[in-house]
Amino acid sequence: MTTNNKAVFLDRDGVLNEEIGTYVWEPDKFIICAGVPESLARLKAAGYYLIVITNQAGIAKKLYTAADVQACHAKLQSACGGILDALYFADAHPSVSESILRKPASGMLEKAVARFNLDVSQCWIVGDRLRDMQAGAAVGVRGILVGETEVGDFAPRVADLRAAADIILGM
């Protein structure tokens, strides 16, 4: 069976919310990046599922809980008008436990591909780390690297989600 279902997989910290140099688990420190709600609305209007995939190793390190992560995700959903289709997080850290979900592994993407019956050739991943791009590549998803955090010549590389949405939408 063929499908036309398409998605944009979105890393969280550094793409959807501001990277503050440490773990972000408190809603009052969870600052949504400029242009994110509008960019997500444009992608949704073009028929994309919007799926957040984020490593949250602070849970494994006992710095915060899954409920803290979910509170930040609720703030994000509210700011974006509830248009996010799924929010997955990997709560493992290599120093504590192994996980096939934690990026650069592709477990979170694989779960979403199955759940939404996605055609990976029509999907994208937008992230600020090479591990995001590696997770996408493992399932055949094209990647867009955001920001200057990672050294290297990965392309395409853009400043923010607005510019990534322009590429995805062919603008």
Task: Please place each PLM-identified region on the residue numbering.
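A short, structure-level motif marking secondary-structure boundaries and short turns
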Residues: 23-26, 61, 93-95, 117-118
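Substrate-recognition element of Asp-dependent hydrolases with the DxDx(T/V) motif
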Residues: 36, 40-73, 84-93, 136
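Asp-based, Mg2+/Mn2+-dependent phosphohydrolase catalytic module
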Residues: 2-4, 67-85, 94-171
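A short alpha-helix capping/helix-coil boundary motif
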Residues: 16-20, 53-56, 88-90, 110-113, ...
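Conserved protein kinase catalytic core
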Residues: 17-19, 61, 134, 166
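Generic enzyme active-site microenvironment
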Residues: 9-11, 53, 126
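Charge-dense, low-complexity intrinsically disordered segments
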Residues: 26, 30, 63, 99, ...
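Active-site neighborhood of HAD-like aspartate-dependent phosphohydrolases
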Residues: 2-49
